[in-house]
Amino acid sequence: MLVTPLLLVTLLCVLCSAALYDSSSYVYYYQSAFRPPNGWHLHGGAYAVVNISSESNNAGSSPGCIVGTIHGGRVVNASSIAMTAPSSGMAWSSSQFCTAHCNFSDTTVFVTHCYKYDGCPITGMLQKNFLRVSAMKNGQLFYNLTVSVAKYPTFKSFQCVNNLTSVYLNGDLVYTSNETTDVTSAGVYFKAGGPITYKVMRKVKALAYFVNGTAQDVILCDGSPRGLLACQYNTGNFSDGFYPFINSSLVKQKFIVYRENSVNTTFTLHNFTFHNETGANPNPSGVQNILTYQTQTAQSGYYNFNFSFLSSFVYKESNFMYGSYHPSCNFRLETINNGLWFNSLSVSIAYGPLQGGCKQSVFSGRATCCYAYSYGGPSLCKGVYSGELDLNFECGLLVYVTKSGGSRIQTATEPPVITRHNYNNITLNTCVDYNIYGRTGQGFITNVTDSAVSYNYLADAGLAILDTSGSIDIFVVQGEYGLTYYKVNPCEDVNQQFVVSGGKLVGILTSRNETGSQLLENQFYIKITNGTRRFRRSITENVANCPYVSYGKFCIKPDGSIATIVPKQLEQFVAPLLNVTENVLIPNSFNLTVTDEYIQTRMDKVQINCLQYVCGNSLDCRDLFQQYGPVCDNILSVVNSIGQKEDMELLNFYSSTKPAGFNTPFLSNVSTGEFNISLLLTTPSSPRRRSFIEDLLFTSVESVGLPTDDAYKNCTAGPLGFLKDLACAREYNGLLVLPPIITAEMQTLYTSSLVASMAFGGITAAGAIPFATQLQARINHLGITQSLLLKNQEKIAASFNKAIGRMQEGFRSTSLALQQIQDVVNKQSAILTETMASLNKNFGAISSVIQEIYQQLDAIQANAQVDRLITGRLSSLSVLASAKQAEHIRVSQQRELATQKINECVKSQSIRYSFCGNGRHVLTIPQNAPNGIVFIHFSYTPDSFVNVTAIVGFCVKPANASQYAIVPANGRGIFIQVNGSYYITARDMYMPRAITAGDIVTLTSCQANYVSVNKTVITTFVDNDDFDFNDELSKWWNDTKHELPDFDKFNYTVPILDIDSEIDRIQGVIQGLNDSLIDLEKLSILKTYIKWPWYVWLAIAFATIIFILILGWVFFMTGCCGCCCGCFGIMPLMSKCGKKSSYYTTFDNDVVTEQNRPKKSV
């Protein structure tokens, strides 16, 4: 027996922060010859403890245990068991330890000691102070190992492992074999020195950390968070970041969705037709000499036996030895096709004597049943009994049937049709293996009928909707009450990620809102502490920066807590004043131009689950993928680093640009320019009107008036203005008009004039002219007013319709502009769409579906095909990672540009020409847009140009001094000449003015200084003959082949937002709205005050006098003026009232008496 020395490493500890059970322990075994390089390795077997028990004594009340015997076993049926004594150990004596053993199915391995002659039934007597480790099978010892007690002074542990049936004594390997079998039972036989602790274990995968060939740390692949993370990425050391993972659960259920609810199957019916043998001769004597014809033997299936020719034959019933004999067949040949079942069936016909022919054929074993028929044949058939062999009997037809009972063969008259009903028992809300309309896979099925039925999906007899990878996304089943829609979801959340912060596994990010989670950006965070999920806590702490892992604006600390990242710059930033409060004067030679500019400031982050993308749910593919090493880790590290940089750069960008609390734009005092909204605003006015007293004392009548009515009211103002009514008449478009309202005074005046004109006939007839004239003028007024009202109604309707059309056009233009922004955003996902489309590519394999490949081919061929898919899909992921890197670099540059635009264009006024819009910058207003910012630049651009003569500078040559030069100072402009005179003007605006001392810089010389160099100093300047372009081109473009990169593999277009045309259209719509202002014919409201009649004023006067008399009577007749005297302030009355009231006193008996006042002494 080959025994390989093994090293036992026992690690009994709590699994740090990722422990699944508080009392978890495990044992890790590996060969001592295994010396891997330093680092983490998925090697060997670990055994996790699943049950712990103890025992103090199993020798009973006897003074000791019996050495050399096996006793005290317990059934375990486990991968491993460890039986350990106390740390001090147990003595090798019958008073403490006797035997320890393990049963591996039919093999038993044990350790014992026995020093008695004829007292050791299994091992025989051993040498003193030696131990025996033996293995036996079927009661026969086939392995013996004798070791000294000096090596093992006491018994401490006995461990059995199914891996190569390894057995360890006190940690040393003492037995192994080439078989791997679970431990069925084990035990320790002892009297004292215990207790013995039994640890039953199950085998799990393990990731071990080796240093110099020795395992220093072990992580169990047991489904715990730490085990899932470590065993999926083959490492136990993780840098801060996010790590997607898949927790594949064991699928125990399976269902099939059939295309048809029922299937009809028509089986083949085999027809056997029998006929009368016309040339058959009478049989010789003896039953064995009867010849058979037309033998038909049925196999499995359905059969029909046609005996139609028997219609001319007469059936002969059984009568002792005569006629038929078929007690084992309860049917006649006429009913043999009535659905009878057989395991075997053979039919043949013969011709023999009716006397005894059938009965002897059955007795002799030639048939199971025999049917006899008479056809009136001659008596030429010989007998079959021993005494009748030479006699002749009537010949008849004999039908032999040989059969056995069963169900392989069934008779029928017509081809049978069997209907199989298919029942779609769909398992919901659990991970299952499915076969949906012939497509197999694994998924989590949910019923989505309520949300999908209203959209008429798959209404035209469709069965399923496939996703980009070719798998079923939604399928429909015809139920009893209509269509039922189901959605296939991944068994596990493909977006779930482990969060590692400070080198520790602290939480999980998932797209599912689970109990105890808290929302971070667009994901839900679940904190993990000691391997368990904790309830969420509110985010209360703010940090200026995050040295750990961050997700958006949230910082995840090593203890799993969440803090909000608020940079200090954002807290101390002072908001600039962006309100426009002053009018900017622009020269007439310039135009105000509005320019829009879109800058992308953020990118969409992606989460890559490399293993899920490449292999899906295929376990075979995942095993094969282990050979590719850390390629997924490299891709993931690139994507994670991009996400981290994106978050930090985006926070820094907003901290340097967006002040705290500045979230609401202030648009007060902003002119609307040519967009006239005066119709929507209240125009302040102070119309001339009468006083409050006039409104109280007069009745006012309002009517629609003309623009001439104001002049009429001014003309008739005054006490006797009604007398000037006709004189104040006005003309409107050549017609004489008067307001249609006539007061009582005017009515009296014109009536009197009319009556007087009729008093003396023709002599006074001219007095009626004023009455007729004013009547015609007022009729003109009414007619013109009605005409203007009708015209204004037409203008209002036309203008309103035009305004509505302009508004609709404006909304359409705005929609197009927003659509272009949306297109920019949608283009960000083009590379993702291309990556997902790669799942449909087979990359040279027979199929793009991994499950189909493994179903169609054997393991070796399938692995070769899947290897092509893995290589192709990894290439797609690499392209995606590279594209995101390039996009991040571009977006970072765009953010830098946006920062400059905000600082220079928004917060200040740029002096750079055409940096903030086109031309000289005036004002910039930023606006949030998807994934970026839209800047609206206001600038002024030249409209006309003046052709002037520019001069670099002046050289001054004084008479008594050396010459010097003057040039314009930086930023002051340039010198120009106009009509023989010299001026200075700004370079960007023509404003010539006299040159002053502050506009110039004095140079010491009028000469320009140059540096003289030769050709060898500046090698970048070459002559034409130094470079032969054709010669250089021929070095590259000759007959040789040069491989150029395939740029189609990386096609990423930088989106550019262009909404200039839409802004122009909106400007046109604004102009159209301005054109829709209604220019109404001016009308006025004429308000005429009518005075009350004279009797009304007389009644008012009488009422006032009566009121005064009653008030005076109350004052004098009450005896005491009461409060009225004081209130009205009538001092004399108050004094008199006071004197009068002192002479009278009212007593309780209501007797009024006069009192004498004493005289005053002076």
UniProtKB/Swiss-Prot annotation:
<feature type="glycosylation site" description="N-linked (GlcNAc...) asparagine; by host">
    <location>
        <position position="947"/>
    </location>
</feature>
<dbReference type="InterPro" id="IPR043614">
    <property type="entry name" value="Spike_S2_CoV_C"/>
</dbReference>
<feature type="glycosylation site" description="N-linked (GlcNAc...) asparagine; by host">
    <location>
        <position position="247"/>
    </location>
</feature>
<keyword id="KW-0812">Transmembrane</keyword>
<keyword id="KW-1133">Transmembrane helix</keyword>
<dbReference type="Pfam" id="PF01601">
    <property type="entry name" value="CoV_S2"/>
</dbReference>
<feature type="glycosylation site" description="N-linked (GlcNAc...) asparagine; by host">
    <location>
        <position position="579"/>
    </location>
</feature>
<feature type="glycosylation site" description="N-linked (GlcNAc...) asparagine; by host">
    <location>
        <position position="237"/>
    </location>
</feature>
<dbReference type="GO" id="GO:0075509">
    <property type="term" value="P:endocytosis involved in viral entry into host cell"/>
</dbReference>
<keyword id="KW-1164">Virus endocytosis by host</keyword>
<protein>
    <recommendedName>
        <fullName>Spike glycoprotein</fullName>
    </recommendedName>
</protein>
<dbReference type="GO" id="GO:0019064">
    <property type="term" value="P:fusion of virus membrane with host plasma membrane"/>
</dbReference>
<feature type="glycosylation site" description="N-linked (GlcNAc...) asparagine; by host">
    <location>
        <position position="212"/>
    </location>
</feature>
<feature type="signal peptide">
    <location>
        <begin position="1"/>
        <end position="18"/>
    </location>
</feature>
<feature type="glycosylation site" description="N-linked (GlcNAc...) asparagine; by host">
    <location>
        <position position="960"/>
    </location>
</feature>
<feature type="glycosylation site" description="N-linked (GlcNAc...) asparagine; by host">
    <location>
        <position position="1051"/>
    </location>
</feature>
<feature type="glycosylation site" description="N-linked (GlcNAc...) asparagine; by host">
    <location>
        <position position="163"/>
    </location>
</feature>
<dbReference type="GO" id="GO:0046813">
    <property type="term" value="P:receptor-mediated virion attachment to host cell"/>
</dbReference>
<feature type="site" description="Cleavage; by host furin">
    <location>
        <begin position="690"/>
        <end position="691"/>
    </location>
</feature>
<feature type="site" description="Cleavage; by host furin">
    <location>
        <begin position="537"/>
        <end position="538"/>
    </location>
</feature>
<feature type="coiled-coil region">
    <location>
        <begin position="1055"/>
        <end position="1083"/>
    </location>
</feature>
<feature type="glycosylation site" description="N-linked (GlcNAc...) asparagine; by host">
    <location>
        <position position="1038"/>
    </location>
</feature>
<feature type="glycosylation site" description="N-linked (GlcNAc...) asparagine; by host">
    <location>
        <position position="669"/>
    </location>
</feature>
<feature type="glycosylation site" description="N-linked (GlcNAc...) asparagine; by host">
    <location>
        <position position="425"/>
    </location>
</feature>
<feature type="glycosylation site" description="N-linked (GlcNAc...) asparagine; by host">
    <location>
        <position position="103"/>
    </location>
</feature>
<feature type="glycosylation site" description="N-linked (GlcNAc...) asparagine; by host">
    <location>
        <position position="178"/>
    </location>
</feature>
<dbReference type="GO" id="GO:0039654">
    <property type="term" value="P:fusion of virus membrane with host endosome membrane"/>
</dbReference>
<feature type="glycosylation site" description="N-linked (GlcNAc...) asparagine; by host">
    <location>
        <position position="979"/>
    </location>
</feature>
<dbReference type="InterPro" id="IPR002552">
    <property type="entry name" value="Spike_S2_CoV"/>
</dbReference>
<feature type="glycosylation site" description="N-linked (GlcNAc...) asparagine; by host">
    <location>
        <position position="530"/>
    </location>
</feature>
<feature type="topological domain" description="Cytoplasmic">
    <location>
        <begin position="1117"/>
        <end position="1162"/>
    </location>
</feature>
<keyword id="KW-1043">Host membrane</keyword>
<feature type="glycosylation site" description="N-linked (GlcNAc...) asparagine; by host">
    <location>
        <position position="676"/>
    </location>
</feature>
<feature type="glycosylation site" description="N-linked (GlcNAc...) asparagine; by host">
    <location>
        <position position="447"/>
    </location>
</feature>
<dbReference type="GO" id="GO:0044173">
    <property type="term" value="C:host cell endoplasmic reticulum-Golgi intermediate compartment membrane"/>
</dbReference>
<keyword id="KW-0165">Cleavage on pair of basic residues</keyword>
<feature type="transmembrane region" description="Helical">
    <location>
        <begin position="1096"/>
        <end position="1116"/>
    </location>
</feature>
<feature type="glycosylation site" description="N-linked (GlcNAc...) asparagine; by host">
    <location>
        <position position="1074"/>
    </location>
</feature>
<feature type="glycosylation site" description="N-linked (GlcNAc...) asparagine; by host">
    <location>
        <position position="51"/>
    </location>
</feature>
<comment type="similarity">
    <text>Belongs to the gammacoronaviruses spike protein family.</text>
</comment>
<keyword id="KW-0843">Virulence</keyword>
<dbReference type="GO" id="GO:0055036">
    <property type="term" value="C:virion membrane"/>
</dbReference>
